[in-house]
Amino acid sequence: MEYQYPLDYDWSNEEMVTIVKFYEAIEKAYEKGIVREELMGLYRRFKEIVPSKAEEKKIDKEFQEVSGYSIYRAIQKAKEIEEEKLVKM
């Protein structure tokens, strides 16, 4: 995509790579679909880096402003569907 991901420069390089992979998974959920377990695994890792609900909401808002994709909606949908199913927004 042609936009800049919201990143916190206090994160380590490894954490930034993990966060970018999570953003790419959200994009994939909207564009092609992604296996639920893959998305939820990346979300769990995201939550290890961003444990605060307030910070998660801030990042979601920033990501949605640049991409048009909602992290919250994608994760809610993933939580609602059965295992091994595709999350497709």
From Swiss-Prot:
It comes from the Bacteria. Belongs to the UPF0223 family. This is UPF0223 protein BCAH187_A4080. It comes from Bacillus cereus (strain AH187).
